[in-house]
């Protein structure tokens, strides 16, 4: 197998920026002369429509004003509103958990509002111990923080208890600190089995589910035969509810074998689960609104990301909930007027797990190189993530939907060895006309041409940098160009996986 050194990559000679099929140079020699040379490349990516790379001019001074910069970040964090949120701006895996973990010590409550165990957040404690959380909010490592699992979350109890056991065995106290909504729906093992059966049925239009049972559980919720956490308090009627749910699955999927022994075993399991869960069960709607009245500070931790939103994402290659701003209110039972600052988390490049449109994807060895440099493998599934350049069109769309007050740009350090970096700034129809917004039509997304700006890399290690002014000039220009293109300031910049590897801007 041929090895590649990321530090030797150049736009004109490596698969991270050129086609494996053909490349046609349109405007002379490639390369920088200190003032951003103009050039035009046209290349094919597998069977996709050709993408276009245009010259970038010298970055203008950002139209975004930056005020109140504090090296410690304390002023920046404490200025966040009473109810703030951290949401993903891409297709998930942006690094939301790290920011939530850092912010949590300044908030009384951290809450999950949607999704389930398909949301994988990796965080590290002060000793560098790694925790992969799927249901428990990332604020759990901060001893004084209360963690809420809201009504919009679907809860797999075996998975939840496994996370709690792992945390407590590593010295993290969970008793009295995790509150589970009595309105949250229960996700059963059979939901996971059904998820796999349904995926097999749809093999020709493979969506790429995590097979965690999220879709089937939300389906049960919507058709109104789901079972909620509060139902565990009524074990006299629980068997009938579960029988209805299992019978429905058996009638729908021939491969699902359901018998009375299964029902009996599940009922006995859930009697024990109910007893263990009881101390955690809470009317979280009342709890949250009471906390707001008491001026408690609340941080909402979004799962997945806006581009996976059931309404606004690349449907049907999406999740089954609303991981955008609207999901905060419906998933926690709080009023829109109380929601304040929302921070959007976005990688310095783009990744996606599973199938679906990905306009700025880098194909071949170039994508592999970026994947290994960024260790892009799913927290939940372990699957390799598809990698590509930062998609400004999609990011701007996410900023419009969510009304972000600021952005957290993560993994800037992963790009450190590249000689040149690209930003996907414009989508064009196959006929060359410009798309004015992010399209809902996935067929069109597969055909569009992406117009890129090319910027110089900084080719130096920035993982130890903690002040924005100490970043290389090219790195600062990259950050400021993103701000200029989307109209939202970048307040946090990730330069490594550790808690301290964060620049406050």
From Swiss-Prot:
Chain sites annotated for binding GTP: 92-98, 120-122, 385, 411-413, 494-496
EC numbers, comma separated: 6.3.4.4
UniProt keyword annotations, A-Z: Chloroplast, GTP-binding, Ligase, Magnesium, Metal-binding, Nucleotide-binding, Plastid, Purine biosynthesis, Transit peptide
Sites where the protein binds substrate: 379-385
Transit peptide: 1-60
UniProt xrefs under Gene3D superfamilies: Adenylosuccinate Synthetase, subunit A, domain 1, Adenylosuccinate Synthetase, subunit A, domain 2, Adenylosuccinate Synthetase, subunit A, domain 3
Main location per the UniProt record: plastid
GO molecular function terms attached to this record: adenylosuccinate synthase activity; GTP binding; magnesium ion binding
Requisite cofactors: Mg(2+)
Catalytic activity line of the entry: IMP + L-aspartate + GTP = N(6)-(1,2-dicarboxyethyl)-AMP + GDP + phosphate + 2 H(+)
Entry binding sites for IMP: 93-96, 118-121, 210, 224, 304, 319, 383
Note on how the cofactor is bound: Binds 1 Mg(2+) ion per subunit.
One Gene Ontology biological process: 'de novo' AMP biosynthetic process
Transmembrane segments: none
Residues that coordinate or bind Mg(2+): 93, 120
Record localization: Plastid, Chloroplast
Protein task: Plays an important role in the de novo pathway and in the salvage pathway of purine nucleotide biosynthesis. Catalyzes the first committed step in the biosynthesis of AMP from IMP.
Quaternary state and interactors: Homodimer.
Family, similarity comment: Belongs to the adenylosuccinate synthetase family.
UniProt protein name: Adenylosuccinate synthetase, chloroplastic
Organism: Nicotiana tabacum
Gene field: PURA
């Amino acid at each position: 197998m041929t090895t590649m050194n990321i530090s030797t990559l150049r736009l004109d000679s490596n698969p991270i920026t050129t086609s494996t099929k053909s490349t046609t140079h349109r405007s002379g020699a490639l390369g920088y002369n200190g003032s951003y040379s103009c050039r035009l490349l046209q290349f094919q990516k597998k069977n996709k429509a050709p993408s276009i790379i245009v010259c970038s001019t010298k970055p203008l001074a950002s139209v975004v004003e930056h005020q109140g910069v504090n090296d410690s970040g304390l002023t920046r964090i404490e200025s966040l509103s009473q109810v703030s949120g951290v949401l993903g701006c891409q297709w998930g895996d942006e690094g939301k958990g790290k920011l939530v973990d850092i912010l949590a010590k300044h908030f009384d409550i951290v809450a999950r509002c949607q999704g389930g165990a398909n949301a994988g957040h990796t965080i590290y404690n002060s000793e560098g111990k790694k925790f992969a959380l799927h249901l428990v909010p990332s604020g759990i490592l901060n001893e004084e923080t209360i963690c809420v699992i809201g009504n919009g979350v679907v809860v797999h109890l075996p998975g939840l208890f496994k996370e709690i056991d792992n945390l407590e065995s590593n010295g993290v106290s969970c008793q009295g600190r995790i509150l589970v909504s009595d309105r949250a729906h229960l996700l059963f093992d059979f939901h996971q089995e059904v998820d796999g059966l349904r995926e097999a049925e749809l093999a020709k239009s493979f969506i790429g589910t995590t097979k965690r049972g999220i879709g089937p559980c939300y389906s049960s919720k919507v058709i109104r035969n789901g079972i909620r956490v509060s139902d565990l308090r009524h074990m006299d009627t629980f068997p009938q509810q579960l029988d209805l749910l299992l019978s429905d699955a058996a009638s729908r999927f021939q491969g699902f074998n359901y018998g009375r022994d299964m029902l009996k075993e599940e009922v006995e399991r859930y009697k024990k689960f109910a007893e263990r869960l009881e101390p955690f069960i809470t009317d979280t709607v009342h709890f949250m609104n009471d906390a707001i009245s008491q001026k408690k500070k609340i941080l909402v931790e979004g799962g997945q990301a806006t581009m996976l939103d059931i309404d606004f994402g690349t449907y049907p290659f999406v999740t089954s909930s609303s991981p955008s701003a609207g999901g905060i209110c419906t998933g926690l039972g709080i009023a829109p007027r109380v929601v304040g600052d929302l921070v959007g988390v976005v990688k310095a490049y783009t990744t996606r797990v599973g199938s679906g449109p990905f306009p700025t994807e880098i194909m071949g060895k170039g994508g592999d190189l970026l994947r290994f440099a960024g260790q892009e493998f799913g927290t939940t599934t372990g699957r390799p993530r598809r990698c590509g350049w930062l998609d400004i069109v999609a990011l701007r769309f996410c900023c419009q939907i969510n009304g972000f007050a600021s952005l957290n740009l993560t993994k800037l350090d992963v790009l450190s060895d590249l000689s040149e970096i690209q930003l996907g700034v414009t989508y064009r129809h196959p006929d060359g006309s410009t798309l004015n917004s992010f399209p809902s039509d996935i067929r069109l997304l597969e055909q569009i041409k992406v117009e890129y700006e090319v910027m110089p890399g900084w080719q130096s290690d920035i993982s130890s940098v903690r002040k924005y002014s100490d970043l290389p000039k090219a790195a600062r220009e990259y950050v400021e160009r993103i701000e200029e293109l989307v109209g939202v300031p970048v307040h946090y910049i990730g330069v490594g996986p550790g808690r301290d590897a964060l620049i406050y801007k």
